[in-house]
Amino acid sequence: MSHLDNGFRSLTLQRFPATDDVNPLQAWEAADEYLLQQLDDTEIRGPVLILNDAFGALSCALAEHKPYSIGDSYISELATRENLRLNGIDESSVKFLDSTADYPQQPGVVLIKVPKTLALLEQQLRALRKVVTSDTRIIAGAKARDIHTSTLELFEKVLGPTTTTLAWKKARLINCTFNEPPLADAPQTVSWKLEGTDWTIHNHANVFSRTGLDIGARFFMQHLPENLEGEIVDLGCGNGVIGLTLLDKNPQAKVVFVDESPMAVASSRMNVETNMPEALDRCEFMINNALSGVKPFRFNAVLCNPPFHQQHALTDNVAWEMFHHARRCLKINGELYIVANRHLDYFHKLKKIFGNCTTIATNNKFVVLKTVKLGRRR
């Protein structure tokens, strides 16, 4: 846990999933402080919109103003709810919207934590363009190293005149005034042909590797299991290309597409609808934190390409949680398959959790691993 003192309230905040005590990661950053310093409680008029609030630092601080928290991360929503409870703040103080929803009209203040992907930022700025006015105060913040010329040019192109502040604690802010500059329409998704198939893959703004097949997925697809039955999971599904391939290779199986990103799940659904509509009745689409709340001993197989970062921080906490959830939800003799960068040494992590691990394939960058849930029902 970490403590954030600001001009609105003193907060105790924690990351979600929780980090280990040996190498704790903070649940807020200097950019959160810097953004809050710019606001005077008496100046806030109209709806307050907060975009990409990773662990709820801004939403908790401004809870008395009933803010809208907007983003593309269900884990961030869970983190914010947990931190509201931790600080004795009514959860209903914050209204949660995902990035594909319509934003509230005529906000008085918009606070933006600049996301990792420029495509998501552009989608969010275009959505804001439909609702902000020239009187809306628009402030964005990030680590100084994450604000580039392209970032500032995007604000200027979509919303209007843009300036940046001096760095403070290695954070920097962007101030923008809306003046409705001329702007051409842009498609909601990016599409490309999947090599070796007749499929067209559609990707919303925040989907990993949205402009083409990433090399890890390409390697994984060469080694996916065939002729499985029952329910199998594409965990952390992204655009669903792995799950789509599983549907094709396992015609007797049902595939559950799971991701914490609403845009990823929407992309997966779109890709099944457009490429294998006859398989829709063998699909389930789930926005979730890994397999939280899913009953034990449900699945015959789980497949995933686990992330090794959360927001801008490098961490294996999300992957570790995925592995534990997979073990709980697999049937006895159920199988977990993963692809990962070789340097992450997931072999020993999986062996620690499952008691076994086998290398299916490897190249100079990636490894495909398989582990089996053994033992009695427990």
Curated annotation (Swiss-Prot):
Belongs to the methyltransferase superfamily. RlmG family. HAMAP family: 23SrRNA_methyltr_G. CDD domains: AdoMet_MTases (cd02440). Signal peptide: none annotated. It is found in: Cytoplasm. Keywords: Cytoplasm, Methyltransferase, rRNA processing, S-adenosyl-L-methionine, Transferase. InterPro entries: DNA_methylase_N6_adenine_CS (IPR002052), rRNA_m2G-MeTrfase_RlmG (IPR017237), RsmC/RlmG (IPR046977), SAM-dependent_MTases_sf (IPR029063), Small_mtfrase_dom (IPR007848). This is Ribosomal RNA large subunit methyltransferase G. The keyword Methyltransferase applies. GO terms for cellular component: cytoplasm. PANTHER family: RIBOSOMAL RNA LARGE SUBUNIT METHYLTRANSFERASE G, RIBOSOMAL RNA SMALL SUBUNIT METHYLTRANSFERASE C. Its EC number is 2.1.1.174. Its main location: cytoplasm. It catalyses: guanosine(1835) in 23S rRNA + S-adenosyl-L-methionine = N(2)-methylguanosine(1835) in 23S rRNA + S-adenosyl-L-homocysteine + H(+). Specifically methylates the guanine in position 1835 (m2G1835) of 23S rRNA. It holds the Pfam family MTS. One of its GO terms (molecular function) is 23S rRNA (guanine(1835)-N(2))-methyltransferase activity.
